[in-house]
């Protein structure tokens, strides 16, 4: 079966550095951090008291207050970014095409905040005080469910949940649905809102988070010798993907083409990556095979780069393994998590959008806080300042998750 070409025609984003793609991209190129102290609950007894938070979000721009009350914030974030993406794409949904337009939006954790408050109501006041909207306001597939209802999208409706690879996997699989004829367009990505007491306590107990409470904006420092864990982030990133001829026929604006998607498993450890980077390398190699490109053709890798001692080094080893010596010498690698923190299930889709924007504007965002780089890495990590490039045709985005689930996407400049 010959595959159909898939392109990106719309993008939407809520992130710790901006509530649109445009504002987020501008902040990232300027090297601005979105990490702040947590003030929406008492963090006195928490080992980490900061996160990458969405700021100034007004749900009523996207839905009624009545509907918002039935949704955890992760759903609201996902719908907001989804509506932004649909409006950006100019894709009109009608009776004739609705069954050919689908949704693939997931979350790594889901409605943690309302799970916490729902459990509290159960314990303190009994089962009759649990909201009748508890289940549909917290389960992972309800971004896709609500958005499809709001916009009349009757094509494939799925929500892949694969920890920190969620957003990327949803985009990759949505692209394949289009490529193999299951849909003509898909709204795809991920959303997360895990900066809750239980979320912060859980990741803190696992010793996964940075504890640099005196300097929150310097806490996320991928590949720096002084890194001490990741910074939790909230937000959503959504793309509208479309079959190329379908997009061209309606005169759509085309940002980039999705040319490669690869997946793999570490088969190594619950939370730590394979030390030699081989798991991530398998996903990158699969994406390059799918795209029909070599390592030397990849101009930029938006790395998973979470600022953990083990993960950062393993990923660079994987990049070098996948791209080869010649590819490693010329590729630029950066981690925008140095500015946004780690958005868990939204990370891969937010960073896929950033990867596309790097092709559109021929600009590579920096890795901030890289003051004392780990020795012997042997790749250009774009420290501190964004980099202007020329004639960059291909860029890759990596996402790796707990359980050893890995994904890579390759986009081509149009």
UniProtKB/Swiss-Prot annotation:
Keywords: Acyltransferase, Fatty acid biosynthesis, Fatty acid metabolism, Lipid biosynthesis, Lipid metabolism, Transferase. The active site is at 164 (for beta-ketoacyl synthase activity), 304 (for beta-ketoacyl synthase activity), 342 (for beta-ketoacyl synthase activity). It is an enzyme of class 2 (transferase). The keyword Membrane does not apply. The keyword Acyltransferase applies. GO terms for molecular function: 3-oxoacyl-[acyl-carrier-protein] synthase activity. It catalyses: a fatty acyl-[ACP] + malonyl-[ACP] + H(+) = a 3-oxoacyl-[ACP] + holo-[ACP] + CO2; (9Z)-hexadecenoyl-[ACP] + malonyl-[ACP] + H(+) = 3-oxo-(11Z)-octadecenoyl-[ACP] + holo-[ACP] + CO2. One of its GO terms (biological process) is fatty acid biosynthetic process. Residues 3-413 form the Ketosynthase family 3 (KS3) domain. Its EC number is 2.3.1.179. Pfam families: ketoacyl-synt, Ketoacyl-synt_C. One of its GO terms (cellular component) is cytosol. It comes from the Bacteria. Gene3D superfamilies: 3.40.47.10. Involved in the type II fatty acid elongation cycle. Catalyzes the elongation of a wide range of acyl-ACP by the addition of two carbons from malonyl-ACP to an acyl acceptor. Can efficiently catalyze the conversion of palmitoleoyl-ACP (cis-hexadec-9-enoyl-ACP) to cis-vaccenoyl-ACP (cis-octadec-11-enoyl-ACP), an essential step in the thermal regulation of fatty acid composition. Homodimer. Belongs to the thiolase-like superfamily. Beta-ketoacyl-ACP synthases family. This is 3-oxoacyl-[acyl-carrier-protein] synthase 2. It comes from Vibrio cholerae serotype O1 (strain ATCC 39315 / El Tor Inaba N16961).
């Amino acid at each position: 079966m010959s595959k159909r070409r898939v392109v990106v025609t719309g993008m939407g984003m809520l992130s710790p550095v901006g509530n649109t793609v445009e504002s987020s991209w501008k902040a990232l190129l300027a090297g601005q951090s979105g990490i702040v102290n947590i003030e929406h609950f008492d963090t006195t007894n928490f080992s980490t008291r900061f996160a990458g938070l969405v700021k100034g979000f007004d749900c009523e721009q996207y839905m009624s207050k009545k509907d918002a009350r039935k949704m955890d914030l992760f759903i609201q974030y996902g719908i907001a970014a989804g509506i932004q993406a649909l409006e950006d794409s100019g894709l009109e949904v009608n009776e004739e095409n609705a069954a050919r337009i689908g949704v693939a939006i997931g979350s790594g954790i889901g409605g943690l905040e309302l799970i916490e408050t729902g459990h509290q109501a159960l314990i303190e006041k009994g089962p009759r005080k649990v909201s009748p909207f508890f289940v549909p306001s917290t389960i992972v597939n309800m971004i896709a469910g609500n958005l499809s209802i709001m916009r009349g999208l009757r094509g494939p409706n799925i929500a892949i949940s694969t920890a920190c690879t969620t957003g990327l996997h949803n985009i990759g699989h949505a692209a394949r649905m289009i490529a193999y004829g299951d849909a003509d367009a898909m709204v795809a990505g991920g959303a997360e809102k895990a900066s809750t007491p239980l979320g912060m306590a859980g990741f803190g107990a696992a010793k996964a988070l940075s504890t640099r409470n005196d300097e929150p904006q310097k806490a996320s420092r991928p590949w720096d010798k002084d890194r001490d864990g990741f910074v939790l982030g909230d937000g959503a990133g959504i793309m509208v993907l479309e079959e190329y001829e379908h997009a061209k026929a309606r005169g759509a604006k085309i940002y980039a083409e999705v040319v490669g998607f690869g997946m793999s498993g570490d088969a190594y450890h619950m939370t730590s990556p394979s030390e030699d980077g081989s798991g991530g390398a398998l996903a990158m190699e699969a994406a390059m095979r799918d795209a029909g490109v070599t390592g030397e053709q990849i101009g930029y890798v938006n790395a998973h780069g979470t600022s953990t001692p083990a993960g950062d080094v393993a990923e660079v080893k994987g990049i070098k393994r996948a791209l080869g010596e010649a590819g490693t010498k010329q590729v630029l690698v950066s981690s925008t998590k140095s500015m946004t923190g780690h958005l868990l299930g939204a990370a891969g889709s937010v960073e896929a959008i950033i990867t596309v924007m790097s092709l559109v504007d021929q600009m590579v965002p920096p890795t901030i806080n890289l003051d004392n780089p780990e020795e012997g890495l042997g790749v250009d990590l774009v420290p501190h300042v964004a980099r202007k490039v020329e004639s960059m045709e291909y860029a890759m985005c990596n996402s790796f998750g707990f359980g050893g689930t890995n994904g890579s996407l390759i986009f081509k400049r149009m």
